[in-house]
Amino acid sequence: MLNEPVAVVFPGQGSQKPGMAEHLVERALDLCARWMDRASAILGWDVARMCSEGGASDLRRTSVTQPAVFTVSVITWRLLHRSGLRPSFVAGHSLGEYSACLLYTSDAADDLLCVD
């Protein structure tokens, strides 16, 4: 795909906003549905609904924000990977450090959603 080194940087809490996954749904509905459903089953609440319809006050709650941002990061990573992108470097800010470590070195995204 690219001949130059590419870095992927994952965001932390504070990057959330209502409708934050809409651009991903438009590009890869199947991928979004699969990962949003997995996250929802693990967490016990509808992650897709919260990402698309949740208000700013809902998304400020850490218990909502961090799993939602992580799930969107997983979907973004999978979409980039599907398109052939293989980054040379990954990094993250705050919560994004977990995303970077886990997604770059493992396929166990479910594990991080279970951390209490």
Where in the sequence are the language-model features?
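Structured catalytic cores of enzymes that bind and process phosphorylated ligands/cofactors
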Residues: 71-72, 100-102
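Short stretches within intrinsically disordered, low-complexity N-terminal or propeptide regions
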Residues: 9, 110-111
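Gly/Ala-rich beta-loop-alpha elbow adjacent to hydrolase catalytic centers
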Residues: 92, 96, 100
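Helix-rich "cap/lid" substructures immediately adjacent to catalytic or cofactor-binding pockets
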Residues: 2-91
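Conserved small/polar residues in nucleotide/adenosyl-binding loops
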Residues: 104-109
